[in-house]
Amino acid sequence: MLNKFVLEQLIAFFQKNPVAQGKPTTDDEVLNVEKSLNVKLDDDFKEFTMRFGGCVVRDAQIYGIHNSEFLGEDTIIDLNKEFSDYLKDGKSNLIIGTDGWGNPIYISPSKTVMIYNHDTDELLTLAANFSDYLEKILKKQ
């Protein structure tokens, strides 16, 4: 479950920036994503996408099924099919977005949020879990 601080900050952010928010994902759509990608969605990510859809939060792109217009037409399924070959154990990771340089950001099976730099072939830990990742994004100025 998303922590209270993160949830309150997200609600306030999307009240000020409604165009950055996508359309919430349904239970059936969550099941379809899990089946299509053969992964179990992280609980915090699932709650996020079921509340806010695919969004832009500050400078972070977080994909879902129904994305903000800023993210275009690609869904989280499309994103994972496009980028999973870049990652070791790519099929067991859930790619949730990219940075400004096209590097995939993903949730690992251990729930850690990571980024893969395709130019240097390096992995970097961004946060211990999805809620922490959101909190770091929301605290950026």
Feature roles, as predicted:
Residues 118-122:
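Short, solvent-exposed aromatic-acidic interface loops
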Residues 123, 127, 131-134:
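Compact, glycine/acidic-enriched structural inserts
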